């Protein structure tokens, strides 16, 4: 098993005694798509800042594909690509200049840099904008430019800090497709996001930071299994009779939409049986968004209660 990122007792105390990180231990395997979640002020940004050498740790150890970030910083940083939350490129350079110059910082030859720039700008639908100054791009295009720039030295580990913040739904889903494909081809990805649907759609494993501590580190599948219940939305055939369900919490959203809470031990089959017996046809069914968000809130509240 190859470890892409390892944090050992990572701590950060800011002036004034504010403890941002309280000893985080974490291993992310090579090839993983890992979500790092937590409320504002939990320590996510500090963790990302330390990994990317933008914030000095107080103590602990960080290694990237076995390279110690303190003792072998050059090799460690060659393995790592960062897409920060804030735009930090020269707005007066062209799109292609920005990504080609970034490759040069890592020793990529000029000819190869131009080859890579075409590859990534095309994949991210920016090739047609390659000669435009970055300041002329829309917010979504700037986000994609940040991803292209981070990939120019072809890192093994890509860290994305809120990569789809402010991006419309259609573009967000397009970026998800690109990131899934990148991960399928072998790039390890760590994602921080406030869009919990994004984490559920993309990530196989998840860590939750709260008050500078890693309070959860598990697979997405195992985390979702902790849900005590799920809420389903059922679309009913028009002019259906008024439904009545025994043993379930439910409500009619409108005359043709039924919302049902199903405990894990109950299952959904009895709902369909009861509705069928009443002559009610179910046209479609979906989960009420967002399952992960419900669980995230309950876990954070649970940990806050433990600290009280």
Swiss-Prot record:
Annotated gene: yadG
GO CC term, one of those recorded: plasma membrane
Biological source species: Escherichia coli (strain K12)
One Gene Ontology term of the molecular function aspect: ATP hydrolysis activity
Protein name: Uncharacterized ABC transporter ATP-binding protein YadG
Domain annotation ABC transporter: ranges: 5-236
Induction info: Transcription is increased specifically in response to 2,4,6-trinitrotoluene (TNT) and its indicator compounds 1,3-DNB, 2,4-DNT, and 2,6-DNT.
Source species, domain of life: Bacteria
GO biological process terms on file: response to X-ray
Cross-referenced Gene3D superfamilies: P-loop containing nucleotide triphosphate hydrolases (3.40.50.300)
InterPro entries: AAA+_ATPase, ABC_transporter-like_ATP-bd, ABC_transporter-like_CS, ABC_transporter_ATP-binding, P-loop_NTPase
Annotated binding of ATP, by residue: 38-45
């Amino acid at each position: 098993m190859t470890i892409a990122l390892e944090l050992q007792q990572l701590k950060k105390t800011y002036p004034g005694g504010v403890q941002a990180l309280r000893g985080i231990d974490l291993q992310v395997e090579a090839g993983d798509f890992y979500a790092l979640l937590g409320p504002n002020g939990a320590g996510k940004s500090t963790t990302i800042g330390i990994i990317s050498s933008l914030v000095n740790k107080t103590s602990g150890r960080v290694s990237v594909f076995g390279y110690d970030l303190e003792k072998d910083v050059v090799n460690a940083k060659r393995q790592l690509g960062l897409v920060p939350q804030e735009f930090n490129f020269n707005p007066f350079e062209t799109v292609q200049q920005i990504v080609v110059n970034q490759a040069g910082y890592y020793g990529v030859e000029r000819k190869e840099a131009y080859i890579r720039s075409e590859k990534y700008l095309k994949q991210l639908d920016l090739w047609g904008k390659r000669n435009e100054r970055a300041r002329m791009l829309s917010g979504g295009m700037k986000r994609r430019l940040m991803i292209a720039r981070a990939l120019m030295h072809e890192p093994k580990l890509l860290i994305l800090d809120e990569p789809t913040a402010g991006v419309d739904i259609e573009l967000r889903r397009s970026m998800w497709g690109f990131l899934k494909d990148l991960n399928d081809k072998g790039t390890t990805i760590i994602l921080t996001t406030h869009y919990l649907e994004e984490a559920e759609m993309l990530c196989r494993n998840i860590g939750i930071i709260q008050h500078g501590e890693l309070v959860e580190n598990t697979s997405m599948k195992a985390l979702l299994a902790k849900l005590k219940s799920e809420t389903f939305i059922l679309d009913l055939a028009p002019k259906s009779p008024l439904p009545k369900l025994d043993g379930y919490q439910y409500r009619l959203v409108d005359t043709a939409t039924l919302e049902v809470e199903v405990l894990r031990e109950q299952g959904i089959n009895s709902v369909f049986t009861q509705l069928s017996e009443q002559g009610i046809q179910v046209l479609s069914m979906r989960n009420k968004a967002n399952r992960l968000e419900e669980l995230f809130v309950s876990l954070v509240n649970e940990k806050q209660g433990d600290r009280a």
